[in-house]
Design a protein with these regions (language model features):
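Conserved binding/recognition cores within well-folded domains
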Residues: 1-96, 100-102
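Conserved short segment within the HATPase_c
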Residues: 107
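Short, surface-exposed, low-complexity cationic segments
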Residues: 112-115
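Cytosolic nucleotide-binding catalytic cores of signal-transduction proteins
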Residues: 121
């Protein structure tokens, strides 16, 4: 488990990757399409990717705001997920890579409408 210290200038809707500062001299490139989910750890976040996990000193809200809204959605105060990684939705939970995550009450309407919108388009 690598522990990057911070994220440098972040993504826009057209950005395909972000750079994470791992130490004073090294930046690690993370492809946005490799991100599975982001979990809040108070003032830190854990970014789970296909290739590993990264812990970054940043809040979930500020990091989520910098991600493309058509690719990622906040499902709970503790989780933001990649929309294309959602395997199923049942009641107030989603499944990603065989693991169930509860959708928070304040996020359920947005999550379901976003998923329906993706089905229509």
């Amino acid at each position: 488990l690598r522990k990057p210290r911070e994220v440098l200038d972040h993504s826009t809707t057209e950005t395909k990757s972000i750079f994470v500062k791992i130490d004073k001299k090294k930046l690690q490139k993370i492809e946005l399409n490799k991100i599975v989910l982001i979990e809040s750890l108070k003032d830190y976040i854990r970014i789970k990717t296909d290739l590993g996990k990264y812990i970054i000193h940043k809040t979930l809200s500020s990091f989520t705001d910098e991600l493309p809204p058509d690719k990622f959605i906040r499902i709970h105060r503790s989780f933001t997920v990649a929309i294309d990684r959602i395997e199923s939705v049942e009641g107030n939970s989603i499944e990603i890579q065989g693991e169930r995550f509860t959708i928070g009450r304040s996020y359920i309407t947005e999550v379901k409408s976003k998923i329906l919108q993706d089905l229509i388009s």
